[in-house]
Amino acid sequence: MRLSLSTTICSCAMFAVSSSIQAAKVWTVDELVEKNIEARGGIAAIRAMKSLKLTGKLLLNQGQFEMAIVQTFKRPAQVRFEATVQGLTQTQVYDGKSGWQINPFSGRKDPERLSSDDSKGLAEAASEFDGSLVDWKAKGATVNYLGTEDVDGTLAHKIRLSRPNGDVEYIFLDPDHFLEIRTLSQRIEHGVQLAIETDLGDYEKVNGVYIPFATETGKQGSTDKQKTMINKAEVNPVVDDKVFAFPAAKSKK
């Protein structure tokens, strides 16, 4: 089942009226979080996901450069990203404690450890397998509702989530469907403040959970964004922990 938020909102006038009514309501953070979780499929369906494998393509340089990608997630906090082009595969992994990568595009074919700063994005993706708003209190985060803000013509609900490590994420929810349509992640890497913006859409329901099949990610304000297009999503595939482990050194003969 495919749900295109932008198409639905733009083509149906009654949804615009509904948006105005929803926006006029005085919302609390708890209500919006509950609405978001329900919209995604419900807490039971979300927690039933023990692993997730996404296959698709990554478009760079405004679509001029294409890579085949595979993203594999596994509880409690493991993730593996693979991007392949012309027979070369770049691999980035977070094993639950630290990150590592193999980057043949920089002339390095052997695995190398990543610093804690370089692993931040991977660690966040792995630890937020359920989504940032699920169990935010248990994660030690602070959440505030900041009212509504225009997101490309949609008056979205804006939520600020502050993590214990100081990172901040702004989450924008569609006023009708309560699914994420944009996130803005602010974090410090190597002493530099980064602001990464991600637009989400083309939601499909897989095993009872809505998953965005199209995302665009880049620095806030930049027109050059990476576009990810998923063509296959597998919920609860068998995933061996070995795929996340740092490869053993090859014996030299």
Predicted regions and their residues:
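Positively charged n-region of N-terminal signal peptides that target proteins for export
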Residues: 1-6
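Extracytoplasmic
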Residues: 49-51, 76, 138-140, 154-156, ...
